Amino acid sequence: MQDSSFRIVDLSVESAKAKSYDNHPIATVNDHEVRISTMTEAYHWHCHPDSDESFLALEGGLFIDFDDRTVQLLPGQMITVNRGVRHRTRPIEG
């Protein structure tokens, strides 16, 4: 029986739900949404004017393109993109 004051999220189960590109919420922390994404293609260029965005690579890894450089994020690594910074994400394979 699970206590209603918490919810255990199994990230491997959540990521297995996706057969192609997928991005869906798995939790809410205060006023922030935690999402899990399976990337099979590049996401479009964009920025977030009012909030930072953090990425945590679980498996496979990803590239994060900025206007002046590209960063490679490997499994177990995390990065926070500051608000207002234009970026796009794309999988390492693809």
Question: Language-model features: where?
Answer:
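A short, N-terminal "cap"/entry segment at the start of jelly-roll beta-barrel domains
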Residues: 1-35
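Conserved short histidine dyad/triad with adjacent acidic residue
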Residues: 19-20, 33-49
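Short strand-coil-strand connectors
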Residues: 30, 65-69
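Short, conserved beta-strand element in jelly-roll/cupin
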Residues: 38-39, 48-65
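Short acidic-glycine-tyrosine-enriched beta hairpin
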Residues: 68-83
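Ligand-binding loop in jelly-roll beta-barrel domains
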Residues: 83-94
